[in-house]
Amino acid sequence: MIGLVGRKVGMTRVFTEEGVSIPVTVVEVEANRISQVKTLETDGYAAIQVTTGAKKANRVTKPEAGHFAKAGVEAGRGLWEFRLENGEEFEVGAELNVELFNEIKKVDVTGTSKGKGFQGAIKRWNFSTQDMTHGNSLSHRAPGSIGQCQTPGRVFKGKKMAGHMGAERVTTQNLEIVRVDAERNLLLIKGAVPGSTGGNVIVKPAVKA
């Protein structure tokens, strides 16, 4: 399914004609340049590879430089891939822009969530705290029991515990497109999207719409 790679600019709000305030996230979508077209015959699946934005020449590795030169496109800040369906055809060097979403009402947005570092079970998994008083001296924010007894004699895999939180791939589904601004290459999406300001986000038509 074809989507677009953009950059999260931040949040603002827009007003409807009735005066209702709608919170929106602004996503800047510079032209997505197609750097490679993958086919069933050569790669085993059909997809397009895109890049967007710009990258300093001294930051482009030799393999990357060769790849972009072969495609005849300017080096971008990364490479992303979208699977093709229903025999869609694209050419290397072609550009995709926000007008792709002119007829689409709902989208799924994928980004990298904000990193929170090492966090306890209360913040990380929304556990309840234990008593602050009533004889409890040291276990106010402890998770509590983590298992049973000699049987099974171990802690099950996947047990929710303290650990690294955030900085992982997150998708928020069924977000509404409020406005497509083709002149300024902006998408205004209702509500919040994953990640920090300036982070890369992938916007695709909603799969559950």
From Swiss-Prot:
GO terms for biological process: translation. InterPro entries: Ribosomal_uL3 (IPR000597), Ribosomal_uL3_bac/org-type (IPR019927), Ribosomal_uL3_CS (IPR019926), Transl_B-barrel_sf (IPR009000). GO terms for molecular function: rRNA binding; structural constituent of ribosome. Signal peptide: none annotated. One of its GO terms (cellular component) is cytosolic large ribosomal subunit. Gene3D superfamilies: 3.30.160.810, Translation factors. Methylated by PrmB. Pfam families: Ribosomal_L3. Keywords: Methylation, Ribonucleoprotein, Ribosomal protein, RNA-binding, rRNA-binding. The modification N5-methylglutamine is found at residue 150. HAMAP family: Ribosomal_uL3_B. One of the primary rRNA binding proteins, it binds directly near the 3'-end of the 23S rRNA, where it nucleates assembly of the 50S subunit. Belongs to the universal ribosomal protein uL3 family. Part of the 50S ribosomal subunit. Forms a cluster with proteins L14 and L19. This is Large ribosomal subunit protein uL3. It comes from Vibrio atlanticus (strain LGP32).
